[in-house]
């Protein structure tokens, strides 16, 4: 009755409880998603890494010690692979490309390394007594179509004498040498003033007070050889194939390559030589076209040939000793000195400049484009400086950049330009090194005639500042920062790091923990399966095995090539820049492979392409449905969406695997009981224990809830408890008197227990009552379960006995019926047999009586 009263008082609570139970049951059957690890997915991230070089150095002269040291590179692949990536859009930025920085550092290191063993010209920082050597030219040479070789201006070369220390340190001797005027500067002192009336003037080398001068070794050549930059294993090079790509922004035509195309490290200013060409139209590239400080790179679509010549002035190289075991190689000229020059086709140049002007006018919305010579600066900037046959040319380009174009001229297809543009050039032997401040190089003279033919494939321009509302824009040739030269070739490349480990939600959950014996051969991918980067996640996941087979084999092949290149340098006292990079590439490949395998081992996924886990998928990472993820998204899109949570997911997988290994160890320790209780699964026992704990916890929770509800109900009825302690009725003993004399009627046997003071006593009393309550309920539950089992056993035994007796009865009935059937059959057969025998006997008798009947008939007839 008490229970029924509580149910009636809290009927609405029962309804809410039933509703809550239904909601929990509905949620419990909802679809659960689990984290699954995939190895070999086509995912990448932007990265910076050490690139190594590949070059076909065997096709060039083997005897020459080329400064680029391409003999130390790995051989180029005769069949380079390029994998198209469909449905992939990638962002490129040529102005923030680490490949440019790396190439710049490599070229600087190569120059420094090749010049390190060469002679230092510090002893030459002495006073030079110089006179003019040869050259009687008086014309200004402004005729742009005159191709005859012109004489060098008077004073262009100096015949200098100076004192040098001999092998014996306390003795000096005077020697003579020829220097170009650009390589020496006059000394303004008293001695020069005293000799002003003579033909001698005091000079010094131009770099003596600012730079350390090193003479290039005699056998060093500067002819550029194409260098291919290659990514190590675990990395890839993405290439933009958009023909109109300006170097920054998204590119929708992306492919992946192992190495770049052959890049010639041509060191030049104003004009870019022997590079690649734009495939369709001229491309203008600038970090900010409206900022006149930024350099503008013009990528031509058609090359313009430039032919440069230094006439044979009967130049010979003479060796001048400047110290113990050191020699200065100077120039000796017999006869007149003719000037170096370069020739460019006027028609080809004007056509190119016309297209450049039109392109600049369209981009800047200007009606007039003006080209002017440089305003001033170092000779390397004001002239077109480059290396030709070992000599460093400085050519005046004022005849190339001295024109004005407007909408009427740049749209004119019939330009009157004939003949050849001739650029006067000067030669320097003391070169300001472009690698940095404070370095200079002395280039020994080259004997004989020098000719070189190059292709102009780009321009370096700067824009003049001024009034913004002007309709005219003035551009001048520039350069000097060699990074711009490399950018014009590397604008379409970027290096990415392959992330072969992918995580995604699936319905599969790891059920059985198995220890793998060994890991399969999976390495860091560098090319191969990136062709599937544009496919959906579901399409890629079914082909992971085939994709992963290429990985380790690619690493091994690349490692062998690098090792052969390193072994080829063992005869050298030190490795070149390329050798160091090859060693770094080998280390990077191994590190990348071991890192991935370590993660797979920590997660318990060694040797698996697809590995399920016990980590539930959290919708806060991504709330997309499975169908939307696997059917509509690519792996790279998915990776970018969950990139912020990969670290958290990795740690959860690791912690889950650690816990799983602990559980496995515990299970192995309990496995000895399986022989005794093999009809039960150990995991089931753990499940039973969990259910038992849940039931006990539920009972305790219900006890607390009902206690609180009872207290609230009494408060609502006007009863205020003395304390937070709930007073439970305690039954009186049978030997205690009940009530007092004044009380009448039947009294109950309940009384209130005493109150306790203090928090500890109150807590202990409540805890004891709660434990007693749980014990009593559990005891009642066990008794009820025992009675149920006993009742079910008794009823079951009675049912079995009834079924057994019923079986015996029906068996007996079937036996009797079968016997009766046999008896009836036997009787029927016997009776039928008797009748047949009787009929046969009667028939036989009838046959036997036929003669008698015939005789009797005849007798009657005769009577």
Swiss-Prot record:
One of its GO terms (cellular component) is viral envelope. Disulfide bonds join 53-73, 118-217, 125-208, 130-160, 230-259, 240-251, 308-342, 388-452, 395-425, 605-611. A motif (YXXL motif) lies at residues 719-722. This is Envelope glycoprotein gp160. Keywords: AIDS, Apoptosis, Clathrin-mediated endocytosis of virus by host, Cleavage on pair of basic residues, Coiled coil, Disulfide bond, Fusion of virus membrane with host endosomal membrane, Fusion of virus membrane with host membrane, Glycoprotein, Host cell membrane, Host endosome, Host membrane, Host-virus interaction, Lipoprotein, Membrane, Palmitate, Signal, Transmembrane, Transmembrane helix, Viral attachment to host cell, Viral envelope protein, Viral immunoevasion, Viral penetration into host cytoplasm, Virion, Virus endocytosis by host, Virus entry into host cell. Residues 32-691 are extracellular. Some of the most genetically diverse regions of the viral genome are present in Env. They are called variable regions 1 through 5 (V1 through V5). Coreceptor usage of gp120 is determined mainly by the primary structure of the third variable region (V3) in the outer domain of gp120. The sequence of V3 determines which coreceptor, CCR5 and/or CXCR4 (corresponding to R5/macrophage, X4/T cell and R5X4/T cell and macrophage tropism), is used to trigger the fusion potential of the Env complex, and hence which cells the virus can infect. Binding to CCR5 involves a region adjacent in addition to V3. The membrane proximal external region (MPER) present in gp41 is a tryptophan-rich region recognized by the antibodies 2F5, Z13, and 4E10. MPER seems to play a role in fusion. GO terms for biological process: clathrin-dependent endocytosis of virus by host cell; fusion of virus membrane with host endosome membrane; fusion of virus membrane with host plasma membrane; positive regulation of plasma membrane raft polarization; positive regulation of receptor clustering; viral protein processing; virion attachment to host cell. Residues 640-674 form a coiled coil. Residues 669-690 are annotated as: MPER. A motif (Di-leucine internalization motif) lies at residues 862-863. Residues 519-539 are annotated as: Fusion peptide. Residues 713-863 are cytoplasmic. The record marks 518-519 as: Cleavage. Inhibitors targeting HIV-1 viral envelope proteins are used as antiretroviral drugs. Attachment of virions to the cell surface via non-specific interactions and CD4 binding can be blocked by inhibitors that include cyanovirin-N, cyclotriazadisulfonamide analogs, PRO 2000, TNX 355 and PRO 542. In addition, BMS 806 can block CD4-induced conformational changes. Env interactions with the coreceptor molecules can be targeted by CCR5 antagonists including SCH-D, maraviroc (UK 427857) and aplaviroc (GW 873140), and the CXCR4 antagonist AMD 070. HIV-1 lineages are divided in three main groups, M (for Major), O (for Outlier), and N (for New, or Non-M, Non-O). The vast majority of strains found worldwide belong to the group M. Group O seems to be endemic to and largely confined to Cameroon and neighboring countries in West Central Africa, where these viruses represent a small minority of HIV-1 strains. The group N is represented by a limited number of isolates from Cameroonian persons. The group M is further subdivided in 9 clades or subtypes (A to D, F to H, J and K). The gene is env. GO terms for molecular function: structural molecule activity. Residues 581-599 are annotated as: Immunosuppression. Highly glycosylated by host. The high number of glycan on the protein is reffered to as 'glycan shield' because it contributes to hide protein sequence from adaptive immune system. Palmitoylation of the transmembrane protein and of Env polyprotein (prior to its proteolytic cleavage) is essential for their association with host cell membrane lipid rafts. Palmitoylation is therefore required for envelope trafficking to classical lipid rafts, but not for viral replication. Residues 395-425 are annotated as: V4. Belongs to the HIV-1 env protein family. InterPro entries: Gp120_core_sf, Gp160, GP41-like, HIV1_Gp120. Glycans are attached at residues 87, 129, 136, 142-143, 159, 163, 194, 199, 209, 246, 274, 288, 301, 307, 343, 350, 365, 396, 402, 406, 412, 455, 468-469, 472, 618, 623, 632, 644. It comes from Human immunodeficiency virus type 1 group M subtype D (isolate Z84) (HIV-1).
